[in-house]
Design a protein with these regions (language model features):
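Phosphate/NTP-binding elements of NTP-utilizing enzymes
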Residues: 1-200
């Protein structure tokens, strides 16, 4: 194995108590289709999928600030993949730039569209590829929508999980436009995830 450089633990972290995590199962699933995670990627996935004694997410809000090109997308991709398949979650993935949304969409949709992955392909209901309206729909009721942010983002819609990628560019107006989309979640187990890059 090649030698790893760089720190594998957060410089600064606040994580509360939790009963258990689905992180290990999510990693096993994701690693069938993408590379195995680095230590810190696994840790972040464990935090996102941590549960309390009621089997609800222990952390309703999760945030990560990390320099560019360090692998944030692996953990988030694995988080979405597991949420869609295992829990049938309705997920809204938002970012500031279209190419970021395109990249995440292509990475997540590829395993479902590959007919050699029979179990995943059978679970797939539809893939929507129209720019600005990209989405993956599963037969278990789960779906994920990929979009760039606007000041009227997601009004009138309901999601279980909202992800703000490129959150360092998130405006108050954009956040307000999607603030209440998880309040009507039928699972009553909502989560909001912020991913950002620290300023130079």
């Amino acid at each position: 194995m090649a030698k790893r450089y760089g720190r594998q633990t957060p410089t600064y972290e606040i994580v509360g108590k939790y009963a258990y995590t689905d992180g290990e199962q999510a990693t096993a699933l994701a690693s069938e289709f993408w590379d195995a995670p680095l230590e810190w990627q696994q840790h972040f996935l464990d935090v996102m999928l941590a549960r309390d004694k009621r089997d609800k997410y222990a952390f309703k809000t999760v945030g990560l600030s990390l320099a560019r090109q360090n692998g944030k997308s692996w953990s988030v991709r694995a988080r979405c993949f597991y949420g869609l398949i295992a829990d049938g979650e309705k997920i809204l993935y938002t970012c500031q730039h279209g190419d970021t949304a395109d990249g995440m969409f292509k990475e997540l949709s590829a395993p479902f569209e590959d007919e050699e992955n029979e179990d995943l392909n059978d679970l797939l209901d539809a893939v929507r590829k129209t720019n600005g309206q990209q989405a993956i729909y599963l037969k278990n009721g789960g779906y994920i929508r990929f979009t760039t942010r606007t000041n009227n983002l997601a009004r009138g819609k309901s999601y279980d999980v909202v992800i703000y990628d490129e959150a360092q560019e998130l405006t108050r107006e954009q956040q307000d436009a999607s603030r209440f989309v998880t309040s009507a979640s039928k699972k009553h187990n909502a989560q909001v995830i912020y991913l950002g890059t620290p300023p130079n």
